[in-house]
Amino acid sequence: MKAFIVRVLLIFIGAILFIQLWIFSSLVWWRTHEVDTTMFMRIDYWSDTSEPIIHEWLDYDDISDNFKHAILAGEDAKFIHHHGFDWDGIRFALERNNEQGEVVAGGSTVSQQLAKNLFLYNKRSFIRKGQETVATWMMERMWSKRRILEVYMNSVEFGKNLYGVEAAAQYYYGKSAKNLTREQAAFLAALLPDPKYYQDHRNDRKLQYRKRVILRYMNSTQIPE
């Protein structure tokens, strides 16, 4: 019995180490190569294979600065200054969730969201959150802020099977993300809390309010050079 328990523990530890090695090697590769697909994209596609994934990579310098400012205003205003975790944001989210008695605020940074999208599944659990923390820690030490934001903008979801700002700009406005105006950039950034819903409800009051807030604060955000 003791030998069996030891064997199970060794297998469990080996699996954990293998996952960390996979994440580490992937981050090394993606430092200099485009991210063609993410775990989030694959899971989304496997759940409904009737429609293809729409995704097109665009280099950082070819993405409108309007969108860079908008996405940080909407998702992570302290992106430049933290090391992967916004402790004030996490504390605020916990307080709001406690007040409401349910999860109404997240507090995840761009880095945390990207780590989850690249490697993990969407269902909340302590195991997933722990692995997200480890992957975020690795990413922040291996990639520049510029690279993190570049990959995030190219992999985040904007609607059903619609990923990356270039695909979103073409879908919603028929233009490249390089040419997004302030209004257009703010709208795309405002979609992110629930892109599949807002894709078909573009005049939703919450969406329009979020867009106005992003427009108000986007010029105050600092983006990587």
Swiss-Prot record:
InterPro entries the UniProt entry points to: Glyco_trans_51 (IPR001264), Lysozyme-like_dom_sf (IPR023346), PBP_transglycosylase (IPR036950), Pep_trsgly (IPR011812)
Pathway stated in the Swiss-Prot or TrEMBL entry: Cell wall biogenesis; peptidoglycan biosynthesis
Topology term for the membrane: Single-pass membrane protein
Entry's Gene Ontology BP terms: cell wall organization; peptidoglycan biosynthetic process; regulation of cell shape
Function: Peptidoglycan polymerase that catalyzes glycan chain elongation from lipid-linked precursors.
Origin superkingdom: Bacteria
Similarity-based family: Belongs to the glycosyltransferase 51 family.
Protein name listed in UniProt: Biosynthetic peptidoglycan transglycosylase
GO molecular function: pentosyltransferase activity; peptidoglycan glycosyltransferase activity
Transmembrane segments: 8-28
Alphabetical list of SUPFAM superfamilies matching this protein: Lysozyme-like
Record gene name: mtgA
Enzyme Commission (EC) number: 2.4.99.28
